[in-house]
Amino acid sequence: MPNKVKINLEKVSRVFAGPSGERIEALRDVSLEVEEAYTPEGRDVGEFRVLLGPSGCGKSTILRLIAGLDFPDSGKVEVNGKTVEGPGRDRGMVFQKYTSFPWLNVADNIAYGLTIQGAPAAQKKETVAKLVEAVGLSGFEKSYPDRLSGGMQQRVAIARTLAVRPEVILMDEPFGALDAQTRGDMQALLLHIWDETACTVLFVTHDVEEAVYLADRIFILSARPGTIVEDVPVALGRPRDPAMKQTKEFHDLQDYVLACLRRAPGTGHVRVGV
């Protein structure tokens, strides 16, 4: 059974107006594909793809275009073979900034999308119960965001996204503001959830170690105007284990990705890891 193209961008460009009216070219002729594969048993398995590049290279803009929160000046953006015309239930997004509603507790934040969709109370209760356990927030259902750590707030954000069962999860540096230990815990949680749900993930980072550890393949972007300069396969086995970060295979791949970044036009600072 041939693989299915889940996300497709063809020659996408995006230009913004600067504060003084100057032309800021964020993306230029970006083309990429993210596929959905099939196991021998016929199960759909979404790819885990990473967008890696220096700050300001347009990674977040790509996610916003796929999410339907912004639109290209030229080119084509498709999900499941259909042109993206706005946000949809098939896509969910997790941001770096904490996005929990401060007036809602954990359970109600997780159920927010279902509430908007008019889901029955019984469905919301069952979904929240499963997700609270899945993301390790049991006992915090009635807590409010100001009582949660950064890692816990991102667990809420992931659970809220999963509650509406999207086919594609778009993640914009969701662990960038977390300390190293919490970031490692969240990476492990994300990989577990991805394995369980088999959804497609497109994850933005400027951390090379994080990219190599999480991804099936890595799209490497140049500095602004961002364009795809490399598509690097990550030939590491799954499930991933933190111990593999100490292996020669991992370090060789990390060095290769870093070299690709340094060869890319105009690239500056990227984080290698901690």
PLM features: what roles do these ranges have?
Residues 158:
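Hydrophobic anchor residue at the start of the ABC signature
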Residues 104-112:
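Short coil-to-helix segment of the ABC ATPase nucleotide-binding domain corresponding to the Q-loop/switch region
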Residues 111, 115, 120-140, 192:
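Conserved ABC ATPase "signature" region
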Residues 67:
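Helix-to-loop junction immediately C-terminal to a conserved catalytic motif
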Residues 87, 107, 133, 141-144:
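Signature (C-motif/LSGGQ) region and adjacent switch/coupling loops
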Residues 75-86:
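Conserved ABC transporter NBD signature motif
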Residues 169-172:
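Catalytic Walker B motif of ABC-type/P-loop ATPase nucleotide-binding domains
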